[in-house]
């Protein structure tokens, strides 16, 4: 898919004319371009901050030289490069073909012989790459294009040079958790070609089954599965197990090299003597061959029809499995609803498609604003043209058993609080980014902040973009009228209202965690560093080294709460003064192994205690002294921090959390007593349980479970069409959450009845946010959505 160029994109790179955007990666943007002779190439550019690093330039120059030596048939050849340009770039041959990810998502798992054919081609490509002194380090389905005569491996040009490990950068993230090797997850600086062989095995699992071998709810959980549980090989044909299991040996020395793999595969592929045994048509299903031919001829890919239990949109870009046991969702309309044409001077407005308790709420194509919406005065004139909303339940929904998906709850619930209306004159909008959107939106005053490589500030009222940062932001926090962000090695702050630069400093390593509170910015950097900065001017307040390096993710970084910084260092949890770095106390929490191989997660509560989840343990430590109030032990590890609710246990007060296997615990905050525990039917994620209005809400697998906070009695359960993503949001008697089935759901919090749902073009990312009657959500379709929390995409309401 090629996107249009923005006003900030170059029109020429070196001798090439730039035609469009192909995408973006961790190191920069990728463009489609054309040479003077008409040859099309893919050009990968390098981010500005990396280009300013002289050590990176040396590494990049040497790897370009090595990449030129890769000449295998199954790789996309390097055409040209300029590592000394102001913005370094690398051009490779453009291959108009679908990726392996697209083929499997749209056509289903491959037959066993097709998997062998794919494996042989990729193994030969790896032999060429390794022979040039490179390790790919990010071999995955989206980096393998499939053409008629075999696969083509791409994105090896900025791999890690194995001939000079001194040049390996510690502040450049390379690799995808679902497909990386164990040694890469532990230390990405010391991998060898055997790491690519493990990734090949993981990729073959996806090709043969339709799901990756490791598929946690987030990168931390995925790495946990990789290192502790082993691959999920459900659905893998027995005849492929010896091949794939040999590639996925935990010890690198036990894996075959690419030449061994080719020798192992040759008898299966070429023993028949068939002339066409090396082509896609000999092995792939007819539909997949048609997809390849269509892409080669410039035709767009045809999306598969969606069935009730099918694969139509059950596979997102991550390759997650389609739902198997979920109840069927009502099918979307065969076409977008027809919106009456407004007068020439009146812009079109979105029609309300689906009302409360109806089918999926859909934003009709041309009638939905991409970016800023029309003026309120125009909305009043156009509102009369909108068709009335449907009020009946979708026909394909059958009445579920009590307590499930909106049937009568097992226990009567109290009446919800009266709903809060959206601001007068406001109407729903969506804004489409030019790049992927990730994470949870932040709302402050009249702006919503979203990360899409840069930080984008959108006007709450209209959806217009107020500004965006000029730098990439991998980490972001909004506090005290400032945006604090990091592009990796640089920490910077901007005015949250206007986007003006306030300050920027260079850090010694890649920032993977960032928090801001009470005038202090706390960062955690790769290699075990933790730093505190003055939020207003950027001066470094203090720094410690030797912090844990087993889990370098935003969830596992140093924590900042009410003037206290919590650092996991030398097997101890240390409480430091956030302004001075002075140690107040420390507790022997243990190392990663003694904590069950999972990060330590904590919550500081207003009762003067910090509640800590460390593996299978939960502890209550006094904030002032570190004194242990109580200790609780569970049979399974906890991935999420505890949730504290003030008040006595008889009114629902206490500490709530769910373990990795999905069991929900209610602990007495005064003594740690296990008041009740309820086992759900699927594993939990790293998101904390949500407690509101006497209810405990927890997303576990495809189910959203609601329990009575006092007794643990199940109130209701809602079954979504895919795994629940992020933490639900509760406000004004409604609960909002996203799912991997591309839907944003809104339920009545008291009984679980479906209020409305929005069908997006991708998986919901992060968690929805509700503010002043508006729910904000981001999707992998590159859109930010702002919807009426009560009605979804209802008509505009004005005073």
UniProtKB/Swiss-Prot annotation:
Q: Which residues form the Protein kinase domain?
A: 16-271
- Listed result of changing residue 168 to E: Almost completely abolishes autophosphorylation. No enhancement of kinase activity on AfsR. Some constitutive kinase activity
Give me the stretches of Pro residues compositional bias: 325-343, 411-421
**Active site location:** 138 (proton acceptor)
Q: Which SMART domains does the record associate with it? A: PQQ, S_TKc
Enzyme Commission code(s) on record: 2.7.11.1
Where are the Phosphoserine residues found in this chain? Answer: 71
Instruction: List the residue ranges of the region (Disordered).
Output: 295-343, 393-426
Task: State the post-translational modifications.
Answer: Autophosphorylated mainly on threonine residues. Some phosphorylation on serine residues. Autophosphorylation on Thr-168 is the major site enhancing kinase activity towards AfsR, and is regulated though interaction with KbpA.
Cite a single Pfam family from the UniProt record.
PQQ_2
Molecular function GO labels: ATP binding; protein serine kinase activity; protein serine/threonine kinase activity
PANTHER family referenced in this protein's UniProt entry, alphabetically: CELL SURFACE PROTEIN (PTHR34512), OUTER MEMBRANE PROTEIN ASSEMBLY FACTOR BAMB (PTHR34512:SF30)
> Which family does this protein fall into?
Belongs to the protein kinase superfamily. Ser/Thr protein kinase family.
Protein name, per record: Serine/threonine-protein kinase AfsK
Q: Which organism is it from?
A: Streptomyces coelicolor (strain ATCC BAA-471 / A3(2) / M145)
């Amino acid at each position: 898919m090629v996107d249009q160029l923005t006003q900030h994109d170059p029109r020429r790179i070196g001798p090439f004319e730039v035609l469009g955007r192909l995408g973006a990666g961790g190191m920069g943007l990728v463009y489609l371009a054309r040479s003077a002779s008409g040859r099309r190439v893919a050009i990968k550019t390098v981010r500005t901050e990396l280009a300013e690093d002289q050590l990176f330039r040396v590494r990049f120059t040497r790897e370009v030289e090595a990449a030129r030596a890769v000449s295998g048939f199954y790789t996309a050849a390097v055409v040209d490069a300029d590592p000394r340009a102001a913005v370094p770039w690398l051009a490779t041959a453009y291959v108009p073909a679908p990726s392996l990810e697209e083929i499997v998502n749209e056509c289903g798992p491959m037959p066993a012989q097709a998997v062998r054919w794919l494996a042989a081609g990729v193994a030969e490509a790896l032999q060429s790459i390794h022979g040039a002194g490179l390790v790919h380090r990010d071999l995955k389905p989206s980096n393998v294009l499939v053409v008629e005569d075999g696969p083509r491996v791409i994105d090896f040009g900025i791999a890690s040079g194995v001939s000079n490990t001194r040049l390996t950068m510690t502040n450049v993230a390379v690799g995808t958790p679902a497909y990386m090797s164990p040694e890469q997850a532990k230390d990405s600086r010391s991998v060898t070609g055997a790491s690519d062989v493990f990734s090949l095995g993981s990729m073959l699992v996806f090709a043969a089954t339709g799901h990756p071998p490791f598929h946690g709810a987030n990168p931390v959980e995925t790495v946990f599965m990789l290192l502790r549980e082993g691959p999920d090989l459900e659905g893998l044909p027995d005849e492929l197990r010896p091949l794939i299991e040999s590639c996925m040996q935990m010890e690198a020395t036990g894996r075959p090299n690419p030449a061994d793999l080719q020798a192992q595969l040759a008898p299966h592929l070429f023993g028949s003597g068939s002339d066409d045994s090396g082509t896609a048509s000999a092995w792939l299903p007819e539909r997949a061959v048609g997809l390849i031919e269509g892409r080669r001829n410039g035709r767009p890919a045809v999306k598969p029809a969606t069935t009730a239990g099918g694969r139509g949109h059950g596979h997102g870009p991550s390759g997650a499995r389609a739902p198997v046991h979920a109840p069927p969702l009502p099918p979307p309309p065969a076409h977008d609803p027809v919106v009456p044409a407004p007068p020439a001077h009146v812009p079109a407005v979105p029609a309300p498609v689906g009302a409360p308790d109806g089918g999926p709420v859909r934003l009709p194509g041309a009638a939905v604003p991409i970016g800023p919406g029309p003026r309120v005065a125009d909305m009043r004139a156009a509102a009369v043209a909108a068709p009335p909303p449907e009020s009946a339940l979708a026909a394909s929904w059958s009445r579920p058993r009590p307590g499930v998906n909106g049937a009568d709850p097992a226990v009567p619930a109290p009446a919800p609080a009266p709903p809060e209306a959206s601001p007068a004159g406001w109407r729903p909008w969506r804004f489409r980014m030019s790049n992927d959107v990730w994470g949870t939106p932040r709302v402050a005053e009249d702006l919503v902040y979203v990360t899409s490589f840069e930080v984008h500030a959108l006007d709450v009222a209209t959806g217009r973009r107020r500004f965006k940062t000029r730098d990439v932001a991998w980490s972001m926090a909004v506090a005290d009228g400032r945006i604090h962000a990091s592009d990796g090695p640089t920490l910077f702050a901007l005015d949250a209202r206007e986007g003006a630069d306030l300050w920027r400093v260079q850090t010694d390593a890649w920032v993977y965690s960032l928090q801001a509170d009470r005038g202090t910015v706390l960062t955690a950097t790769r290699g075990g560093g933790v730093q505190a900065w003055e939020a207003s001017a950027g001066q470094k307040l203090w720094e410690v080294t030797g912090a844990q390096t087993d889990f370098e993710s935003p969830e596992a970084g140093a924590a900042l709460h009410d003037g206290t910084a919590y650092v996991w260092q030398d097997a101890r949890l240390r409480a430091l003064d956030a302004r001075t770095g002075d140690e107040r106390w420390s507790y022997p929490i243990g190392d990663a192994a003694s904590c069950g191989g999972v990060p330590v997660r904590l919550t500081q509560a207003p009762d003067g205690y910090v509640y800590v989840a460390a593996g299978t343990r939960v502890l209550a430590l006094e904030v002032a002294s570190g004194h242990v109030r109580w200790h609780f032990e569970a049979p399974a590890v906890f991935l999420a921090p505890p949730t504290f609710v003030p008040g006595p246990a008889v009114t629902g007060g206490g500490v709530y959390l769910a373990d990795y296997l999905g069991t929900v615990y209610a602990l007495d905050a005064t003594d740690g007593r296990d008041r009740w525990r309820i086992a759900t039917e699927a594993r939990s994620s790293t998101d904390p349980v949500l407690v509101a209005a006497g209810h405990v809400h927890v997303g576990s697998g495809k189910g959203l479970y609601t329990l009575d906070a006092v007794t643990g009695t199940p109130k209701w359960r809602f079954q979504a069409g895919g795994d629940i993503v992020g933490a639900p949001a509760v406000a004004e008697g409604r609960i909002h959450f996203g799912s991997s089935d591309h839907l944003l759901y809104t339920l009545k919090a008291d009984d679980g009845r479906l209020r409305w749902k929005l069908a997006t073009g991708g998986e919901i990312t992060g968690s929805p946010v509700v503010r002043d009657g508006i729910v904000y959500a981001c999707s992998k379709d590159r859109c930010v959505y702002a919807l009426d929390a009560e009605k979804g995409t209802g008509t505009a309401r004005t005073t």
